[in-house]
């Protein structure tokens, strides 16, 4: 499904469906013997939407026809769960470190099915602003309310498209740009054109003061590599062709059709230019640090993203 300038989506459609894939990985990690993170609400979202490809991680076994053409698929899926678990732990720790240091405002850009407002032990008085499409936020809040879950902080939903004037919406929701804040942009960058990425950071710059912090999952050096793109596309098409025959109800999305393959400024460089102290951790290093390095035969299937942590001077 190609993107348009004003596209929107339900939770099971387009960009919304990718949030279910991430929730599936977090649910699988939570069920594992030695989980790196605990997200008791991830499975709640999956149960609410019913069967789909996002339930692969809980399937007793994959179709034999699929394993014939992609024998390493179980290892690929295991590696992606480890990647998502490491990513989640990185952002969890980033938020808690900042708020325990006295920052009282947290902003989650493109919050999706992120349940941090409910599951993290936030310091008393913390306000968490969640920004995303209206239908995504409505689904999340309604589903968790039906489950009896309550936020562990002062949670504020800001229903707005990040391509629109979200800074005004954020301020109107109670955000105070005159005091320090902590931000996240997780799983967002490939869905933004290069110009929109720059605008996003410029707006964050205009809403932050000294000691504010931001963590970004930035695109790595291989994102635009033609061979990497071709290999990924061919692999997805092979899997889609088999699944259309054996399990047509579990359509494999062409996630890469939702991405913007454009040259863009390195995220770490952007923040350094704007007087932020920056630390960059490659995804492989992050995963290894958590004891979750991918198996050698599938490490090229794991995103080579960069995890950027920055504090404003």
UniProtKB/Swiss-Prot annotation:
Please indicate if the UniProt record lists Transmembrane helix as a keyword: no
GO BP annotation list: methylation
Keyword set, alphabetical order: Methyltransferase, S-adenosyl-L-methionine, Transferase
Q: Name one Pfam family in it.
A: LCM
Q: Enumerate the GO terms in the molecular function aspect.
A: methyltransferase activity
Q: What is its EC number?
A: 2.1.1.-
Q: Which residues form a coiled coil?
A: none
Binding site residues for S-adenosyl-L-methionine:
132, 161-162
Q: What domain of life? A: Bacteria
Protein purpose: Exhibits S-adenosyl-L-methionine-dependent methyltransferase activity.
Regarding protein family, the annotation reads: Belongs to the UPF0677 family.
What PANTHER family does this protein's entry cite? S-ADENOSYL-L-METHIONINE-DEPENDENT METHYLTRANSFERASE YKTD-RELATED, S-ADENOSYL-L-METHIONINE-DEPENDENT METHYLTRANSFERASES SUPERFAMILY PROTEIN
Q: What is this protein called?
A: Putative S-adenosyl-L-methionine-dependent methyltransferase MUL_0706
